[in-house]
Amino acid sequence: MTAPSSSSSASMARANFELNNAIIPLSSTTLDSIFAYDNEAQRAILHAQPWKTDPHFFQKVRISAVALIKMVMHARSGGIYEIMGLMQGKIDVENRTLYVMDSFALPVEGTETRVNAQNEAYEYMVQYLDHSKEVGRLENVVGWYHSHPGYGCWLSGIDVNTQRTNQQFQDPFVAIVIDPNRTISSGKVDIGAFRTFPEGYTSSSSIGGGDSEYQSIPLSKIEDFGVHANEYYPLEVEHFKSSLDGKLLDLLWNKYWQNTLSQSPLVSNRAYTTSQIRDLADKLAQTNAAVLNRNSVSSAPFTTTAGAASVRIGAGKDVAAETEQNSGGSAKDTPAGTAQDAAGLVKEFEQRSKMSAISRASNDAAKLASEANHGLLASQLKHTLFHNHTATPTPASASAPTPIRL
């Protein structure tokens, strides 16, 4: 078995990255409209500000492949510490979309839980933008990005305040969060884009930034995640590439494809996996304590808030009984009303079951197992490609007759 050449290995690695992250190649007609920057049109959009009257105005963010790679590499270089950078792009009002064409890192001081931009970072930002315009890059800053190493893509309280301030003074602005640890574990870029609601605004939709889909949040971050989950909303994220992006990606993968084959996510991400297992054990211990401390048999299993919910249900029944008594028994249950009440009760129990501690722990365990399987499959595939050299039979030996045993 012949080992694959370096060029074919680089092509396979790049193709795998593009497939996992659903990167859309642009056609020649679309290419001109996206990369052509109309300064006057952008100024007119900034003057009109249609997003001021609709907090949900922007629905999508489209990120170029080169900008995505730069942000992921920057996030990965930070290790356990958060990083921060800015993104340049333009506005598409017709499609309610923000385009991210490029990104650049900021020299900031980051910790394991927060990142702070100092005066040096602001000076660097101004100089970078000035030099960009000197070389013909007229795109304005359309957002900022930072990393959450190991704890998912969402906005903390500090992030919400930062994003809200940016939207107040230099809107349109979008916040992008990348988790480099989960990116390595899953093989797909773990990324989220968010915009905050104005202060005091109450969304008519029950879906906030924290409720768009289930996320595995560490126990130490759950409180911060839940408190601010309804103060922002997620945007759909798409990735695209041009022919020039393709050439740049070729150069990048020709340089780094060996690292893809020589490294294993099981080894490079072992600290993250260990922390996830420890967090899962803490969640299960907390769940077990909640079960042991249940005071009522009617409480939903494994739910710390089930007692309060059952009180609300019981109170609702008492109110209904009192209403029927006061009305002289005229408000009798009809079959349609009974069915509707039963359906509502079933839906409420399903919601409580999904939000229960044991359900979340089960989802976290399934996610950990899936990521471990991904790492094992990658290691097995590499072993099969480069170590199992099965001998190919020669034509002479292949054509030789098989002796017949009597």
From Swiss-Prot:
EC numbers: 3.4.-.-
Region Disordered, residue ranges: 320-341
Gene Ontology biological process terms from the UniProt entry: protein deneddylation; proteolysis; regulation of cell cycle
InterPro entries in alphabetical order: CSN5_C, JAMM/MPN+_dom, JAMM_MPN+_peptidase_M67A, MPN
Secretion signal span: none
One Pfam family of this chain: JAB
GO molecular function, one term: deNEDDylase activity
Localization, UniProt: Cytoplasm; Nucleus
Gene Ontology CC terms: COP9 signalosome; cytoplasm
SS bond partners: none
UniProt short sequence motif JAMM motif, positions renumbered to this chain: 146-159
Domain of life: Eukaryota
Ranges for domain MPN: 61-200
Keywords: Cytoplasm, Hydrolase, Metal-binding, Metalloprotease, Nucleus, Protease, Signalosome, Zinc
Record SUPFAM superfamilies: JAB1/MPN domain
Binding, Zn(2+): H146, H148, D159
Function: Catalytic Component of the COP9 signalosome (CSN) complex that acts as an regulator of the ubiquitin (Ubl) conjugation pathway by mediating the deneddylation of the cullin subunit of SCF-type E3 ubiquitin-protein ligase complexes.
Protein name from the UniProt record: COP9 signalosome complex subunit 5
Source taxonomy: Eukaryota, Fungi, Dikarya, Basidiomycota, Ustilaginomycotina
